[in-house]
């Protein structure tokens, strides 16, 4: 204790002023010895006092901690005893009064609704000068809002990748020509709104304008006669030679177009005949489900029909053309000879 340390402290008597000179003369010889003894005693007294003070403080802190721990343990024991006495019915009522747990999105929505509605700050609109300067400038990317829950549908951007081709000069929009023969709107109007005709516009257009094929055949025959006349004259004029080349190109293009029309018409006939057979088989009960032809099967059937309808000379020409085509393809696929090999 601090009081005991003060009582145990060694104190030296105060020297009077009148006896100071006498004391100084007597103690002149023993001054050094007394000084050393006083220093040692002072050091020992200081250490004992410090130790006594430290022990006193530690004792006070330990007593305070013991009191706090006792009070906390008493409070915890009271709380646990009160919780043990609560019934399950009271706990259920308390939970029902609190309500179900809400999601964070509803809380944020409530907070946003409670906020004062002020004038929303919109981004500054670009000036007309900037629009004229950069007409093809892309808009800044917008951040996608997150889903409200994991069960909500995913949010995906409708933006597409920008093409690497740069448009230097924007061409004006040119109105495209519309052919009424192949227009579904015109065919639908002319057929009293029949949807099957509107969907198969090309088929019905070819049926409606089938008389044009006769005009094409007549025009093709006239071009061939004109070409024969120019070739008979055998003039060395450059103008006639150019005309002959032009007529040849026109005849080949028209003949190829006629062949494509015939081939498509034959494909339609093959498909129509196959569908007719399948319907009859289903009606008779021979089949439960129809069988649909593939594109390769249709092409094979068309080739066989065309080959059977050809005459002897036409068959030979077709076979020779086919042989040359296969030979050229095989020649391209053959490896080239090495340089060092003879």
Swiss-Prot record:
Keyword Metal-binding: no
Disulfide bonds: none
Amino acid composition bias (Acidic residues), ranges on this chain: 33-53, 60-71
Coiled-coil zones: 213-267
One GO BP annotation of this record: maturation of SSU-rRNA from tricistronic rRNA transcript (SSU-rRNA, 5.8S rRNA, LSU-rRNA)
Disordered as annotated region, ranges: 1-81, 93-177, 309-342
InterPro entries: RRP36 (IPR009292)
Compartments in which it is found: Nucleus, Nucleolus
Primary location class: nucleus
Source domain of life: Eukaryota
Any matching Pfam family: RRP36
Biased composition (Basic and acidic residues): 309-319, 327-342
Keyword terms of this UniProt record: Coiled coil, Nucleus, Ribonucleoprotein, Ribosome biogenesis, rRNA processing
Keyword Nucleus: yes
GO cellular component, one term: nucleolus
Oligomeric and partner information: Associates with 90S and pre-40S pre-ribosomal particles.
UniProt record similarity statement: Belongs to the RRP36 family.
Summary of the function given for this chain in its UniProt record: Component of the 90S pre-ribosome involved in the maturation of rRNAs. Required for early cleavages of the pre-RNAs in the 40S ribosomal subunit maturation pathway.
Annotated protein name in UniProt: rRNA biogenesis protein RRP36
Organism: Paracoccidioides brasiliensis (strain Pb18)
Species lineage: Eukaryota, Fungi, Dikarya, Ascomycota, Pezizomycotina
Recorded name of the encoding gene: RRP36
């Amino acid at each position: 204790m601090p009081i005991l340390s003060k009582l145990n402290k060694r104190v030296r008597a105060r020297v009077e002023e009148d006896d100071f000179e006498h004391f100084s003369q007597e103690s002149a010889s023993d001054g050094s010895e007394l000084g050393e003894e006083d220093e040692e005693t002072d050091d020992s007294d200081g250490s004992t006092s410090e130790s006594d003070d430290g022990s006193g403080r530690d004792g006070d802190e330990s007593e305070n901690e013991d009191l706090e721990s006792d009070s906390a343990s008493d409070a915890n024991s009271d709380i646990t005893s009160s919780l043990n006495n609560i019934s399950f019915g009271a706990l259920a009522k308390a939970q029902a009064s609190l309500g179900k747990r809400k999601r964070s999105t509803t809380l944020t929505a409530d907070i946003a609704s409670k906020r004062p509605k002020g004038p929303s700050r919109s981004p500054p609109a670009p000036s007309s000068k900037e629009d004229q300067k950069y007409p093809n400038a892309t808009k800044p990317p917008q951040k996608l809002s997150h889903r409200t829950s994991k069960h909500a549908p995913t949010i995906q951007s409708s933006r597409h990748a920008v093409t690497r081709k740069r448009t230097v000069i924007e061409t004006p929009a040119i109105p495209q020509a519309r052919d009424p023969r192949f227009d579904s709107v015109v065919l639908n109007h002319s057929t009293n709104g029949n949807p099957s005709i509107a969907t198969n516009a090309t088929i019905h257009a070819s049926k409606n304008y089938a008389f044009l094929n006769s005009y094409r055949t007549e025009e093709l025959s006239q071009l061939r006669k004109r070409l024969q006349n120019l070739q008979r004259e055998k003039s060395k004029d450059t103008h006639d030679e150019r005309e002959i080349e032009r007529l040849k190109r026109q005849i080949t293009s028209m003949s190829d177009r006629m062949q494509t029309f015939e081939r498509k018409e034959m494909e339609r006939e093959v498909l129509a005949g196959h569908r007719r057979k399948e319907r009859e088989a289903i009606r008779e009960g021979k089949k439960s489900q129809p069988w649909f032809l593939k594109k390769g099967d249709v092409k094979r059937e068309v080739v066989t029909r065309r080959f059977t309808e050809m005459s002897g000379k036409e068959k030979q020409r077709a076979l020779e053309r086919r042989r040359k085509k296969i030979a050229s393809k095989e020649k391209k696929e053959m490896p080239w000879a090495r340089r060092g090999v003879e």
